[in-house]
A protein has these predicted regions:
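N-terminal binding-site loop/beta-alpha segment at the start of enzyme catalytic domains
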Residues: 1-79, 142
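A general structural detector for well-ordered alpha-helical segments in enzyme core domains, enriched
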Residues: 2, 35-39, 62-70, 99-103, ...
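Conserved residues at the C-terminal ends of beta-strands
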Residues: 17, 54-57, 115-118, 152, ...
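Glycine/proline-rich, positively charged
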Residues: 24, 88-206, 214-219, 225-226, ...
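Structural motif
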Residues: 42, 46, 106-107, 167, ...
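Structural motif corresponding to the early beta-alpha repeats
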Residues: 57, 73-93, 118
């Protein structure tokens, strides 16, 4: 295992994401504790020391499980523990401390190594700033309750810049993989953090497992990298970035632990070959060629006059072709239609097309998407 130094603290370059543990009978709120313990111990024995959990994971049971696990195996002082403030639950200033105390109790600790403001977007961030979150962050760090303060991010790049510049962060966490270099914060966000010497944590390096099971044309191109698996080829992209502190992976099998730890122990910074860079570039184009409409989910088109969730409809349409998920996309579309407005309700007012920064034919796209997904 290779490590990243942040203020004298050695962090493993692979982190264990505690959101996708094995569960019992398909119930996400019932972690299979025996199997999950084995996976964590396997990873720790291979040198992993960064454990990433959060308040809502596994229907609010992940923190409890992690706390029990660390106590049972006497690992509290041997790992770097990360959890996140559930910002969406904050309604008043007192909630910051109340929620943190609940988390400390769940994790059975009196301090947290890495504490993040969870899943920030522009509305959420501005709301908690108005409630005093930045002063709260400063206070808990000064008291030693939290060693490092950061944030995880889910919005467009300009919002990332706003949040990044609002505070003296110790680190930040963004979604990045070889496919999503322009998605959300993307490579621009990584480069901004790097320029300012703020370490970056990477989430979704395999895009929720989709890059582990790529389309046939990408499988064919990947053969040149054998014996590396598709997952390992994908992991090499974020692991090679020199300002990446750790790459998170929600591992639920020993094979995943073994493969991912192997990569985190072998990939050097700035080590991508021209051939690998070309593979990532060609793969991105292969995915783009499968895309049905170039929606970036910026939501400029929202709210729709008749309240159709335009980005949601286009996302399901694209996913069916991007990841060979026709059946799943059609099932998810049926679920959406239970409460959501059907594209059939479109009155063709054209407001969405007037404001779309991608200049998409949204009206036609909605008709085509509905025709395919219904």
């Amino acid at each position: 295992m290779k490590y990243f130094d942040i203020g004298g603290v050695e962090v493993s370059r692979l982190g264990f994401g505690c959101m996708r543990f094995p569960v019992i009978d398909g119930d996400n709120g019932k972690i299979n504790k025996k199997e999950s313990e084995k996976l964590l111990l396997d990873a720790i024995e291979r040198g992993l020391n960064y454990i990433d959990t959060a308040y809502p994971y596994h229907e609010e049971t992940s923190e409890d499980f992690v706390g029990d696990f660390l106590q049972k195996h006497n690992l509290c002082d041997k790992v770097q523990l990360a959890t996140k403030l559930p910002c969406w639950l904050v309604e008043k200033e007192e909630d910051f401390e109340r929620l943190l105390n609940i988390q400390l109790e769940k994790l059975q600790t009196d301090y947290i190594d890495f504490y993040l403001l969870h899943s920030l977007d522009v509305k959420r961030f501005r709301k908690i700033v108005d409630l005093g979150v930045l002063d709260f962050c400063k206070k808990i760090k000064e008291k030693g309750i939290v060693k490092h303060i950061g944030f995880s991010f889910h919005d467009e790049y300009p919002v990332f810049e706003e949040i990044f510049n609002a505070n003296d962060w110790d680190f930040c966490q963004i979604q990045l993989n070889y496919l999503d270099i322009d998605y959300q914060a993307g490579m621009k966000g990584y480069e901004l953090a790097t320029k300012n010497n703020v370490p970056v944590i990477i989430m979704e390096p395999l895009k929720g497992g989709r890059l582990s099971n790529p389309p046939e044309e990408i499988r064919e191109m990947s053969k040149k990298f054998e014996p590396l698996s598709y997952s390992q080829v994908a992991l090499k992209f974020p692991l090679s970035l020199p300002n990446v502190m750790t790459v998170l992976s929600g591992m639920n099998s020993h094979k995943q632990v073994e493969e991912n730890c192997e990569m985190a122990g072998s990939v050097e910074y700035n080590s991508l070959t021209d051939e690998e860079k070309e593979f990532y570039k060609v793969s991105r184009q292969a995915y783009k060629d499968r895309e049905r409409i170039g929606c970036t989910a910026c939501e400029y088109c929202m709210p729709c006059t008749v309240e159709i969730n335009i980005p949601k409809v286009f996302s399901l349409w694209n996913k069916a072709f991007l990841y060979d998920e026709e059946e799943k996309s059609k099932k998810d579309y049926k679920e959406y239609l239970k409460d959501g407005i059907s594209p059939e309700e479109c009155i063709e007012c054209g407001k969405c097309e007037d404001i779309c920064p991608q200049h998409l034919e949204i009206i036609k796209g909605l008709k085509d998407a509905h025709e395919y997904l219904k």
